[in-house]
């Protein structure tokens, strides 16, 4: 009989949406002359953080059937803000015109390419020798 009274008087832990912290390490219940503290822990090495609220939320009586005022307000505001939103983005209607690849002579053909093509590669040696001569540093007398 005493265990049933203790279970009835046990206070509900705070829910996830409330503003209070969810750490319920020790819960003390007072029935007449006996005071009992029940640890909400699974193992001795457990940190006792949130185990009691996890057990009570998964039980039959508090399975989310009753909402706290904060949760009800949050749901109401979510409905208000998401009422005007469209569920999917409208598809843009555009046509893709496929371009034919045309050969542009001005892009790929240079004068040096044409000279190599018609005169052979021997003609380019003179330009190379001239460029190398321009790059050489001449010693100036001091």
Curated annotation (Swiss-Prot):
Residues 29-38 have a biased composition (Low complexity). Keywords: Developmental protein, Differentiation, Spermatogenesis. One of its GO terms (biological process) is spermatid development. Residues 17-28, 39-50 have a biased composition (Polar residues). Residues 1-66 are annotated as: Disordered. This is Spermatogenesis-defective protein spe-17.
């Amino acid at each position: 009989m005493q265990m049933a009274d203790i279970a009835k008087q046990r206070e509900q832990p705070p829910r996830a949406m409330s503003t209070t912290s969810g750490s319920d390490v020790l819960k003390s219940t007072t029935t007449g002359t006996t005071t009992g503290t029940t640890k909400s822990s699974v193992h001795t090495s457990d940190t006792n953080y949130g185990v009691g609220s996890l057990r009570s939320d998964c039980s039959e009586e508090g399975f989310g059937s009753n909402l706290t005022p904060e949760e009800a307000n949050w749901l109401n505001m979510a409905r208000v803000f998401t009422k005007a939103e469209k569920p999917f983005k409208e598809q843009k209607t555009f046509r893709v015109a496929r371009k034919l690849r045309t050969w542009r002579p001005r892009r790929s053909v240079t004068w040096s390419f044409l000279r190599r093509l018609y005169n052979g590669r021997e003609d380019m040696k003179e330009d190379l020798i001239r460029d190398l001569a321009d790059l050489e540093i001449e010693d100036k007398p001091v």
